[in-house]
Amino acid sequence: MKKVFALFCILLMALGCSGRQDRYVQISGYAQGGTYTVKLNMKGIGVPVETIRDSVEALLTQIDTTLSGYNRKSLVARFNAGERVPATPLFLEMYALARHYWERSGGLVDCAAGPIFDAWGFGFKNSRFPTEEGISSLLGGMGHLPETLPQEQGMVDPAALGNPCLNYNAIAQGYSCDVIARYLYGIGVKDMLVDIGEIWCDGVNPSGKPWAVGIDRPIDQAEEPSDELDGIWTSEGKPCGVVTSGNYRKFYKKDGRKYAHTINPKTGFPVSHNLLSATVISAGSAAEADAVATWCMVLGLEEAQALLLDSPGLEGYLIFEGEDGEMKEWASPGFTLRK
């Protein structure tokens, strides 16, 4: 996550020809190293658009100054540097969420694996290709995180935890969507789409139809979503988080071998399997979709399929490389993609 720039575009979309008395607003800007968009139906909302815009900006700034490992002045960056930091609600909530998914995944989604990600160059430091001895040393130094953070006079001391290095990238963007959506629900918004790299949507779009989301086709080193979509997924008007995780944007090659940014925290090494991307739909939260998508990418195809089939409230779409080298797809029973 990077600094939030106060650049917004507000568009009012009148729907006179549809017969609906809706008034949609779009707020766009820059956050977390990319662009974001918030679309919402202002029908029945007594809060001015400008206030909503300012509130969204303030929340994104708060997330950046609390949780961004790229912002050296953020609470998590200061914590990772060994500094005692205030136990703010956002800091505590993210830690609790991250630890929950660490426990639920059996350690495969691990916020304390920051040193491993840094060592491979996929974290907050410019490193690359560590030795096996170096990885073993890092794994040995990764401690067990308690269920709750110990506090003293409203402060959290990393030394009391063995000075862990936290990296929330596996759920940060999904969590950010949830924070913005929580604010919108609080002011009475029913129809919304929050897109901060990951997505939370609910209700219908300006045309009165359920929100539709394009699913990327995995193309190596595509820095931005490509124009080539694998298909369109439609929400059916129900609230849900939508997240795609994959190894086709962040990786590097050495001696002819591809090293992807998905790392197994238990082995300390990038995964090597035929699963190219995992799209997860969660009825609960975008943070859950984010965490489970990462979890799937660590597991690989067969175990990811089993996870999605055995998880109520989750649907998934997996793109993988078949034995013939061609891309193939698998979808859980409740996931419908329109090609």
Regions found by a protein language model. Give the residues of each.
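Mature catalytic core of soluble alpha/beta enzymes
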Residues: 4-8, 15-339
